UniProtKB/Swiss-Prot annotation:
Protein name, entry field: Podocalyxin
Family from the record: Belongs to the podocalyxin family.
InterPro entries in the record: CD34/Podocalyxin (IPR013836), PODXL (IPR017403)
Modified residues (Phosphothreonine): T511, T549
Cell compartment(s), UniProt: Apical cell membrane; Cell projection, Microvillus; Membrane raft; Cell projection, Lamellipodium
Keywords assigned by UniProt, alphabetized: Cell adhesion, Cell membrane, Cell projection, Glycoprotein, Membrane, Phosphoprotein, Signal, Transmembrane, Transmembrane helix
Expression (tissue specificity): Glomerular epithelium cell (podocyte) and endothelial cells.
The keyword Glycoprotein is assigned to this record: yes
Amino acid sequence: MRSALALAALLLLLLSPPSLSQEKSPQPGPTPMATSTSTRPAPASAPAPKSSVAASVPAEQNTTPMTTKAPATQSPSASPGSSVENSAPAQGSTTTQQSLSVTTKAEAKDAGGVPTAHVTGSARPVTSGSQVAAQDPAASKAPSNHSITTKPLATEATSQAPRQTTDVGTPGPTAPPVTNSTSPDLLGHATPKPSEGPQLSFPTAAGSLGPVTGSGTGSGTLSTPQGKPATLTPVASSAETQGMPSPMPPSPASPSSSPFPSSPSPSPALQPSGPSAAGTEDTTGRGPTSSSTELASTALHGPSTLSPTSAVRDQRVSCGPPERPTEQLLILNLTRSSPCIHVFQRQSQGEGETEISMHSTDSLPEDKLVTLLCRAAKPTFNPAQDQCHVLLAPMLGSHAVVVKEITIKTNLLPTAVFELLKDRWDDLREEGVSDMQLGDQGPPEETEDRFSLPLIITIVCMASFLLLVAALYGCCHQRLSHRKDQQRLTEELQTVENGYHDNPTLEVMETSAEMQEKKVVNLNGELGDSWIVPLDNLTKDDLDEEEDTHL
């Protein structure tokens, strides 16, 4: 086993030295969110510088190139590319997991005072290569532990940064790239969509990790203790996002935690592919503007006008804007000055702004005029009970005013309203009102009108019946009296015919009447057939003879 390790170390010495480079990127900040992002790797513009790596034991490593879309939180932990010598044996292995995370975080410093870098990627099905170099204090004063490990998404990330696309490549045999898409977890923040960023490429000691394209939530500078400038390979990408992308100003690269000086590497400004999903504050660097950040309030400029109606000191009268005379307006010509005089002042402000101010003088209509207008609208106007409001408007170029509106508000006491409603209780019942109470008083009693109609009908019927009875009695009494008279006359005539009479006066009168009729015919021939004979024409002699003859 030891011989195999020694042979592997010898082979590593013969291989080209690897170099590890990564773009300096801004500190983690708010992560932009995009609904849909498509990325594709582009060929590197320049080869990455190589560095020699010496190991005392051989290492075997089989790697599979992969392309992942995953959030990655990276922080600087070492100087950019430098040579690393490892005297301890190292072993490389390839593992495949269903879900992994790529995270760059700072590890504790080793005994030599050199911090180590830990890079972790996240993808669903992903192949990762691991190479661990053991520390040998005798061989190197500043050994480092560099590993590329695959594991589930780490939860140590405390901030978010613009997503970037990194390309990790090593010389040697390569395999077809594997593309994986992951769902990022932002530790309680809103879940953003993947976006593009710059590509970073670095080779490893043994084998070749194909182009690894990752889309993460953080960025940092990965370097080795004895720095060499890293090569930045831009990536051609096309992103389709929803919403308006917010530009991000370039932010300074994160400082290296290594005590050795590190060479600066070019860091282009990252352009987010979409608005950020959460408004998380970033205290270490500037990131893209979050879509949930409140915009600063700005003063809105525009034409401003005052209310068309300005109330004057008298609450009963208000003045409106001037009116032009028309046939539909009620105009009052005043001998005094108009109660409402408006002065329009136009002032230019800003870009063609116009402000209109309205003023009214102290010349108000007298109380008598207002009272007359209110009494005209309501004859029973009572100033102690009613409130009247008159809206006037001046006429242009004259002292006349326009009466636009007269409003009267009547304040009635509950007792007055109750008395008015008592007279309309029947109408209220028809509308569904069942009861009405004011203190101890209630609705009008129903007994008052309960028997009124039947009583009236009864009285009318009795009066008609009495009239009918009186008419019948009068008719019957008249017929009875007429029968009695007829019967009496009949009896008298019968007695006269039989020669027996009880009333001699009647007989004398009858004989005298007969005689008078004859005499009238004989004596007064000029009268003709007249039955009216004056008594003066009769003589006593005739009467005596008549009496004697009758006896």
